[in-house]
Swiss-Prot record:
<dbReference type="Pfam" id="PF02033">
    <property type="entry name" value="RBFA"/>
</dbReference>
<dbReference type="InterPro" id="IPR023799">
    <property type="entry name" value="RbfA_dom_sf"/>
</dbReference>
<keyword id="KW-0690">Ribosome biogenesis</keyword>
<comment type="function">
    <text>One of several proteins that assist in the late maturation steps of the functional core of the 30S ribosomal subunit. Associates with free 30S ribosomal subunits (but not with 30S subunits that are part of 70S ribosomes or polysomes). Required for efficient processing of 16S rRNA. May interact with the 5'-terminal helix region of 16S rRNA.</text>
</comment>
<comment type="subunit">
    <text>Monomer. Binds 30S ribosomal subunits, but not 50S ribosomal subunits or 70S ribosomes.</text>
</comment>
<dbReference type="InterPro" id="IPR020053">
    <property type="entry name" value="Ribosome-bd_factorA_CS"/>
</dbReference>
<dbReference type="GO" id="GO:0030490">
    <property type="term" value="P:maturation of SSU-rRNA"/>
</dbReference>
<keyword id="KW-0963">Cytoplasm</keyword>
<dbReference type="GO" id="GO:0043024">
    <property type="term" value="F:ribosomal small subunit binding"/>
</dbReference>
<dbReference type="InterPro" id="IPR000238">
    <property type="entry name" value="RbfA"/>
</dbReference>
<dbReference type="GO" id="GO:0005829">
    <property type="term" value="C:cytosol"/>
</dbReference>
<feature type="compositionally biased region" description="Basic and acidic residues">
    <location>
        <begin position="122"/>
        <end position="132"/>
    </location>
</feature>
<dbReference type="InterPro" id="IPR015946">
    <property type="entry name" value="KH_dom-like_a/b"/>
</dbReference>
<protein>
    <recommendedName>
        <fullName>Ribosome-binding factor A</fullName>
    </recommendedName>
</protein>
<feature type="region of interest" description="Disordered">
    <location>
        <begin position="122"/>
        <end position="145"/>
    </location>
</feature>
<comment type="similarity">
    <text>Belongs to the RbfA family.</text>
</comment>
């Protein structure tokens, strides 16, 4: 009997539901439906949501605009997890309302780190000393004459 292979990434259904949950969370946070002083004083972005294969768990990656005060914002979201779950269930038609988990979005930090690495002296020196493809292509074109 052949074993069922698991795909390497999320299924199309997981991605579609994750996007619906992301939109629902962003709408609730934007409208200010949750009465909390921390959430009221911060604009919170939800750049990504990842769903579990059974669609019962949604991990939302959040970041306050400006990237400051992440811990209080995530704590406030955790406090209001039940209300947020109810709002997501109202907006997204699923058999089960997914349990919500909130994590800090680190993609901006990672992008800044990679940008800093690319601008470092070592990388610049390597780029200057490496032969370019244009230089290698010139002798071939000269031999055709």
């Amino acid at each position: 009997m052949a074993q069922k292979q698991t795909p390497s990434g999320p299924s199309q259904r997981q991605q579609r539901v994750a996007e619906l949950v992301r939109h629902a969370l962003a709408e609730v946070l934007q409208r200010g439906d949750i009465q909390d002083p921390v959430l009221g004083s911060h604009v919170v972005t939800v750049p990504e949501v990842r769903m579990s294969p059974d669609l019962k768990l949604a991990t939302a990656y959040v970041m306050p605009l400006g990237g400051q005060d992440e811990a209080p914002v995530i704590a406030a979201l955790e406090r209001h997890k039940k209300i947020l779950r109810q709002e997501v269930a109202r907006r997204v038609n699923l058999k089960y309302a997914p349990e919500l988990r909130f994590r800090r979005d680190e993609t901006f930090d990672e992008a800044a780190r990679i940008d800093q690495l690319l601008r470092s002296e070592k990388v610049q020196r390597d780029l200057e000393s490496a032969p370019r493809e244009d230089d290698e292509a010139e002798p071939d074109s000269a031999s055709r004459d």
